[in-house]
């Protein structure tokens, strides 16, 4: 005899599959309202399913509803206890949500725990996490520590398998350039402008199409009184595909790109000249 609950279970499984497809489709087009509606129904069907709680947290972070995101991450973390990989993944997401509300101390605590979990379980640290922790340490004014994190992240990216793929640029190479650029910015914040400029000049040779590196070079050249070099670096930044428009917006540079205060001031001084 077929159990009487079998049709109900089959119907539930079909509903979950349909809702999951709706969730993925909505998220792909950034329709967060539809995505969260699908998640609400999924969580009603499977209230203890970790992936739906994590998805809620991720989508809430993307739509900048950090209060909801943190609540979901807290619930997900409790469910994931004992699974080091899941714990690390959730804590990394929660740290990002904490950054969204400028809760630097607790974001740092979460990133520290992610890296501790990797170490105690025999895994190499994630360079993306190290770079993120560097950002948080910088926001807390701990620029020496931030610089160390950026350097470690850059080295890990650079030494990773698949760093280069023929003549093409890989995601790992982009990560290395970004981390080393952050290291150079932190070096400037610590007062070593000559050292920072030397690092940036090396990066412009390795990543000639990086508008971020070119903009940093312009700011540092201008601060050093090398005005012709500053103008040339800026023109090269503006001629890149990404362009220099974002770097004319100091709020973007400070709050989104997370340049340190000293570098924001140097860029501001250079931009004043161009007005």
Give, region by region, the residue ranges found by the protein language model.
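N-terminal leader/linker segments that initiate helical-solenoid repeat arrays
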Residues: 2-51, 55
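TPR/TPR-like (Sel1-like) alpha-helical repeat modules
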Residues: 151-155, 211, 218, 222-246, ...
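Residue-level recognition of tetratricopeptide repeat
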Residues: 24, 58, 96, 135, ...
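Terminal, low-structured helical/coil segments at or just beyond the last alpha-helical repeat
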Residues: 243-275
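Residue signature of alpha-solenoid helical repeat architecture, marking inter-repeat boundaries
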Residues: 13-14, 47, 85-87, 124-126, ...
């Amino acid at each position: 005899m077929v159990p009487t609950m079998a049709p109900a279970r089959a119907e539930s499984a079909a509903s979950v599959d349909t809702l999951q497809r709706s969730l993925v489709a909505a998220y792909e087009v950034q329709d967060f309202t539809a995505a969260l509606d699908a998640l609400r129904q999924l969580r009603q069907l499977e209230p203890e399913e970790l992936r739906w709680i994590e998805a809620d947290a991720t989508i809430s972070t993307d739509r900048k509803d950090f209060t909801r995101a943190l609540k979901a991450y807290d619930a997900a973390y409790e469910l994931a206890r004992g699974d080091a990989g899941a714990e690390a993944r959730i804590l990394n997401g929660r740290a990002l949500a904490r950054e969204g509300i400028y809760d630097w101390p607790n974001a740092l605590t979460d990133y520290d725990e992610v890296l501790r979990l990797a170490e105690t379980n025999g895994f190499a640290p994630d360079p993306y996490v190290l770079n993120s922790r560097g950002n948080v340490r910088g926001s807390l004014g701990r620029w020496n520590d931030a610089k160390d994190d950026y350097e470690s992240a850059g080295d890990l990216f650079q030494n990773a398998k698949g760093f280069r793929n023929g003549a093409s640029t890989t995601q790992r190479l982009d990560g290395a350039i970004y981390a080393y650029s952050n290291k150079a910015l932190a070096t400037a914040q610590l007062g070593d402008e000559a050292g920072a400029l030397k690092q940036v000049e090396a990066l412009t040779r390795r990543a000639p199409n990086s508008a971020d590196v070119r903009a940093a070079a312009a700011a540092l050249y201008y601060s050093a009184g090398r005005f012709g070099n500053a103008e040339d670096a800026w023109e090269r930044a503006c001629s890149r595909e990404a362009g220099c428009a974002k770097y004319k917006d100091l709020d973007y540079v400070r709050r989104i790109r997370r340049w340190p205060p000293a570098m924001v001031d140097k860029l501001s001084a250079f931009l004043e000249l161009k007005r």
